[in-house]
From Swiss-Prot:
UniProt organism field: Scolopendra viridicornis nigra
Main subcellular location of this protein, as a coarse class: secreted
Any GO molecular function: toxin activity
Protein name from the UniProt record: Scolopendra 20466.84 Da toxin
Additional observations: Shows similarity with the venom allergen 5 from wasps. This similarity may explain why patients with allergies to centipede venom also display allergic reaction to wasp, honey bee and/or yellow jacket venom.
UniProt lineage: Eukaryota, Metazoa, Ecdysozoa, Arthropoda, Myriapoda
């Protein structure tokens, strides 16, 4: 997964 604007893992 990649980093989203919230700083979390998009894959999560």
């Amino acid at each position: 997964c990649q980093v989203v604007e919230r700083g979390l893992d998009a894959x999560a």
